[in-house]
Amino acid sequence: MGQTSSGRRDFLADRILGVAEFSHAHWFFGNLYEVLVKIPHRVAAAEASRELPRSPFGAGSPGRYYAPIAPINAPAAIAALVAGWNHADSRPWLLVAAASSTTGAAATAYLLRSINPDLFFSPQPLSETRRNPLLKRWYRVHAVRLAASAVALAAIHEARTLRLRSRG
């Protein structure tokens, strides 16, 4: 019975790691894309119209792409840590992944609550003098989020690789 329970736990840990790796890859590459093409500059300066409302899920808003998957990032990393706790070789990587994912989630929560409403969703675009300091802060916090998602993704990938090698 212990072997079956252990087998189920390993199966569950593998599945959770797969979900965590996918969701963190989505998060990292989405964050990278936002920086490279300066999505915040575009969305912050866009005038509201019938076709392009200034809303979290309006056309052009990254919210549409993150909403389905983003809420599972930190929970998946934490669940992977719990499910894989019995594997000493991958435990440190899972700890790093959970901590990094939680850091990224906290940075995201800060942006969503403190910066994004004024910067992106006010009825009209802010003046340049009001917009530029918010954009600067947004990019600084986003750098933390990008680094956290990269570290979490790399740690999850390493934990998954170690688990696969141990079956070898």
Predicted segments, located by residue:
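Basic/polar N-terminal segments that are highly enriched at the extreme N-terminus
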Residues: M1-R15, R163-G168
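Interfacial loop at the N-terminal end of multi-pass membrane proteins
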Residues: T4, A13-R15, S23-N73, D118-L135
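Interfacial segments of alpha-helical transmembrane regions
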Residues: D10-A25, A83-G104
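Short hydrophobic alpha-helical membrane-entry/anchor segments
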Residues: Y33, V82-D89, Y110-R113, E158-G168
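Core segments of transmembrane alpha-helices
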Residues: A67-L81, R145-L153
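Hydrophobic alpha-helical transmembrane segments of integral membrane proteins
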Residues: A97-P117
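Eukaryotic polytopic
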Residues: L135-H142
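Terminal transmembrane helical module of multi-pass membrane proteins
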Residues: A143-R160, R165
